[in-house]
């Protein structure tokens, strides 16, 4: 007598993007979490999908009849992700956890889930769904046990829109997309080399064009202020060679969009690349300057990148071409003094850097820095909600942690003084965008600074306007 064949069933899935209590407030968040967008696009059509994104104040239905609840998590969202997972499991639901944080904290995450996924899901998700359908879900699925991911999954924007119930937006809200994945560099503070990997992958031109046109149709609504949609390119590094970069920019030029992108300083030293960026619709590049000190850049494995003088020159060339440069800077108590912070504030103001971002160096799980600091016993706090880059979670030989954080926050806030905002708007292109984003940052930073001073009984006669 033969055993009956077990039939796979159609599943009802809920994908959740949690928001940590100390996650930053921003008006620049993309319309959906890219990890969830990829999962939706990988999931066969016979399965029903719902999305709940707490960054958009979506409510979570804990009483839904879901066959599987999938939760993705960054480090800052991990505590909230575990809270949600525990609540669903109390109600007897199957929970799967994945994402950056879970991939490098598997043992911790296992206590809150029926199953965890480590690494990229592209080549393992079909197996997970099949096992759920057959009632034999395994405790762990690790990307290392599956064939390497060599392609980018085209996003199914129609299905994402249907599952998320997100309304159409104008050109002031960003639609996320991948053009490439992977990065060949090994910056010590970055998780990309150990998660996405160093293998550089590009979208097929026809796939990219089709996705952009579909995204326009389901997510964009033109108005008097914006005739083109704004896409946020979520690539870790858009170009690894000038030839491939220019091919990508020529392709984007024909798509009639505006976009912003993370970009390597190396390519911005070429004026023709700047011109092609602008002509292809790029209105903003986010550049990881990290520091204006050469010794600090070398400590981060970025010593090959340049100097403050070249930074200033490139920023001005971009500005003259019509391109905003958003600068990201890291502050490290082992490498940077209070005077260095003052110098950084001066540099940002002098160069009118668009929407500057300051971050205290944070050893995120999965980075080379995390393993080094943990091995040396230098991590002082494992409260993941504090891993938002404005809290000091590492040991400092030179500074009191509270004094260092306060200096950092006041320095950061100074870059959004009224005079700096006015000069930024005056000197940069896209003046309305500069004003709106600067005001939002100023409001958020003021709230964070006031809360910090209140919590630590810091009295100040601050005169920052």
Task: Give residue ranges: language-model regions.
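Flexible glycine/acidic-rich beta-alpha junction loops that bind and position SAM and/or redox cofactors
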Residues: 22-23, 105-108, 295-301, 331-339, ...
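Acidic, low-complexity intrinsically disordered segments
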Residues: 2-217, 226
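Structural recognition of alpha->loop->beta junctions
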Residues: 108-127, 276-286, 343-358
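Structured beta->alpha junctions
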Residues: 73, 77, 101, 121, ...
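Radical SAM enzyme core and accessory elements
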Residues: 2-15, 45-51, 67, 132, ...
């Amino acid at each position: 007598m033969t055993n009956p064949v077990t039939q796979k069933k159609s599943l009802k899935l809920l994908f959740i993007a949690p928001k940590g209590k100390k996650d930053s407030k921003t008006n620049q968040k993309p319309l959906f979490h890219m990890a969830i967008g990829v999962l939706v696009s990988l999931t066969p059509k016979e399965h029903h999908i719902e999305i709940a994104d707490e960054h958009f104040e979506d409510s979570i239905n804990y009483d839904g009849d879901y066959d599987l609840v999938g939760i993705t998590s960054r480090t800052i969202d991990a505590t909230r992700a575990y809270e949600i997972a525990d609540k669903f499991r109390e109600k007897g639901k199957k929970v799967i956890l994945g994402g950056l944080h879970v991939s490098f904290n598997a043992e911790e995450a296992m206590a809150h889930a029926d199953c965890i996924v480590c690494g990229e899901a592209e080549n393992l998700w079909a197996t997970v769904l099949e096992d759920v359908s057959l009632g034999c879900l395994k405790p762990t699925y690790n990307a290392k046990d599956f064939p390497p991911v060599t392609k980018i999954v085209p996003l199914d924007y129609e299905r994402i829109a249907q599952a998320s119930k997100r309304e159409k937006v104008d050109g002031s809200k960003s639609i996320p997309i991948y053009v490439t994945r992977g990065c060949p560099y090994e910056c010590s503070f970055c998780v990309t080399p150990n998660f996405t990997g160093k293998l550089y992958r590009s979208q097929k031109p026809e796939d990219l064009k089709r996705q952009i046109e579909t995204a326009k149709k389901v997510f964009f609504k033109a108005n008097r202020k914006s005739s083109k949609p704004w896409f946020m390119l979520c690539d870790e590094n858009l170009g690894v060679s000038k030839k491939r970069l220019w091919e990508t920019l020529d392709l984007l030029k024909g798509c009639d969009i505006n976009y912003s992108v993370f970009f390597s300083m190396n390519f911005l030293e070429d004026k023709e690349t700047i011109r092609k960026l602008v002509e292809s619709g790029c209105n903003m590049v986010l550049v990881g300057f990290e520091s204006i000190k050469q010794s600090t850049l070398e400590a981060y494995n970025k010593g090959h990148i340049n100097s403050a003088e070249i930074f200033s020159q490139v920023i001005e060339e971009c500005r003259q071409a019509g391109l905003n440069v958003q600068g990201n800077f890291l502050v490290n108590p082992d490498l940077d003094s209070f005077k260095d912070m003052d110098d950084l504030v001066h540099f940002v103001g002098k160069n009118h850097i668009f929407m500057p971002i300051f971050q205290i160096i944070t050893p995120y799980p999965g980075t080379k820095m995390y393993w080094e600091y943990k091995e040396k016993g230098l991590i002082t706090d494992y409260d993941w909600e504090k891993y938002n880059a404005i809290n000091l979670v590492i040991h400092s030989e030179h500074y009191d942690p509270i004094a260092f954080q306060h200096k950092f926050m006041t320095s950061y806030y100074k870059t959004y003084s009224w005079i700096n905002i006015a000069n930024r708007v005056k000197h940069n292109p896209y003046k309305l965008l500069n004003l709106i984003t600067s005001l939002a940052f100023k409001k958020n930073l003021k709230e964070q600074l006031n809360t910090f001073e209140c919590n630590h009984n810091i009295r100040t006669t601050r005169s920052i306007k």
